[in-house]
Amino acid sequence: MARKCYITGRQAKSGNKRSHAMNKTKRRWGANVQKVRILVDGKPKRVYVSARALKSGKVERV
């Protein structure tokens, strides 16, 4: 299972890390996703959900 939000689709983004000399190195910013149990089609399922979706009430924990 990918570390991607089941509700909003948020996932890791990529970009460059820049040193003081402005050298660039590829890096990734991970999304704040938590593994939680939610109801999917009336059955509990353990999925990754972003913290933003949890805080906004888009999903109900079981």
From Swiss-Prot:
The keyword Protease does not apply. One of its GO terms (molecular function) is structural constituent of ribosome. This is Large ribosomal subunit protein bL28. GO terms for biological process: translation. InterPro entries: Bacterial_rp_bL28, Ribosomal_bL28, Ribosomal_bL28/bL31-like_sf, Ribosomal_bL28_bact-type, Ribosomal_bL28_sf. Disulfide bonds: none annotated. The gene is rpmB. Belongs to the bacterial ribosomal protein bL28 family. Pfam families: Ribosomal_L28. It comes from the Bacteria. HAMAP family: Ribosomal_bL28 (MF_00373). Keywords: Ribonucleoprotein, Ribosomal protein. GO terms for cellular component: ribonucleoprotein complex; ribosome.
